Each structure stands twice: as C-alpha cells, then as structure tokens.
Design a protein with these regions (language model features):
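N-terminal small/polar loop signature for handling phosphorylated ligands or for N-terminal nucleophile
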Residues: 1-35, 39-43
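Flexible glycine/proline-rich
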Residues: 42-202
C-alpha cells in the first residue's frame, strides 16, 4: 500500500525495481493524485504503451526500468541487495493497472497473465477466449472494445453467455457472479440474441 504522495510512491517503486516484474494498481489515470507514470519516469522507465482502447481498463501502462538490485537467500530468509556502481544491464518490467477492481481484473487477464506465463517458460501464453452464443440482446455503440462481466453456461446444444447486470468497474459483487467477460467490439450498434461472440475466461 502506498499513499498518493511522490515520496511514498518513490519508496515503493524503488523496492519493486529489484524484482523481475512489478505490478502496481491505481494512480495511472489523469487525476491530480495519479502520480505513478511521473514517478516511474524518474527511475528512467521506458513505456511500451500507456492506455488501451478497452472498457473497463483503459488507463493501463506497461514498460520497463533499470533493475536497481537483487534478492538473495540467507540464513534468516530472503533479503534485498541494492546495486552499487553502474547499471548492470538487467530490467524490471512493470504493469500499472487501474485502481478499480473490475478494470484491474480485465487488464490482468489480457496483459499480466500472458507475461507471467512467458516468464515461466510456458509455450501457450495468450489470453484464453472461447466462443458462445448471446442469450440476450446487448446494446452496442461504444467507441472502444468492451469486456463486460458475463456468465457462461452450456449444454448439448452449445455454450451460451449472458451479460451480468453491473454498475461499473467498481461493482465487485456483480463481477463475482460472472465467470468471464463477453467481448463487444467497438463501433457495433447492436448485438442480437444468438450472435456468436468471444468470451475472455478468467
């Protein structure tokens, strides 16, 4: 946990910069106290992308910064050892996820989980999608691709998906009722009953 101050964020990011991968949640939007990107730049961060054309989850960042130390094992457990001298060429990769829980979960499934699988040496690293028929019509018209909490159910005649009623990216109760996210592409005005759509599993 970090307070929304530059000093506290600096300390936490300094600690995280000794790991191979650092995850941050919150502070990556455009508000007065969203300081994560600014502080990361002070560490020499290189950003691969800042923001994604999805909803929820638009304010997400991914990049890397010079690794500032390492972890070693001793008799009393694991401890950190800051690097002295010039940078040794190693990187700490980072994700800055949105603070809202549904947004963070969508971004984790889309971006973070594949990165973790890659670091673990897995051959299949991509997000997992399945196809299902819409059990009810869904209104479209969004300018970004939407990932809406949804419930998959199946039988002998195939798999259906139904959007879970929710009140936004902070609605953890509604999100918990689903088992995936139905993918609604940008620019489509209407998604009729029976349409085959993709569903992101979580």
């Amino acid at each position: 946990m970090a307070r929304d101050t530059r000093a506290d964020l600096f300390e936490r990011i300094a600690q995280g910069s000794m790991w191979d991968l650092m995850l941050l949640s919150g502070g990556v939007s455009m508000g007065k106290y969203d300081l994560v990107e600014e502080v990361l730049r002070e560490f020499g961060a290189e950003f691969f992308f800042t923001g994604a054309l999805i909803q929820p989850g638009k304010p997400v960042v991914f990049g890397r910064l010079p690794k500032r130390g390492s972890f070693q094992h001793g008799e009393d457990g694991e401890y950190s050892v800051p690097h002295d001298g010039p940078w040794n060429g190693e990187w700490t990769y980072f994700f800055g996820l949105p603070g809202n829980p549904v947004s963070a979960q969508v971004c984790f499934a889309l971006f973070v989980a594949p990165m973790l699988r890659a670091l673990a040496g897995r051959s299949e690293i991509a997000p997992v999608f399945v196809e299902a028929r819409l059990a009810e019509e869904v209104k479209g018209g969004a300018r970004v691709t939407r990932f809406l909490p949804a419930e998959l159910s199946g039988g002998w005649d195939g798999v259906e998906v139904r959007v879970v009623g929710w009140q936004g990216s902070g609605d953890v109760v509604a999100n918990a009722r689903g088992n995936g996210y139905v993918v609604l592409p940008a620019g489509v005005e209407h998604f009729p009953i029976g349409l085959t759509v993709r569903v992101l599993l979580r």
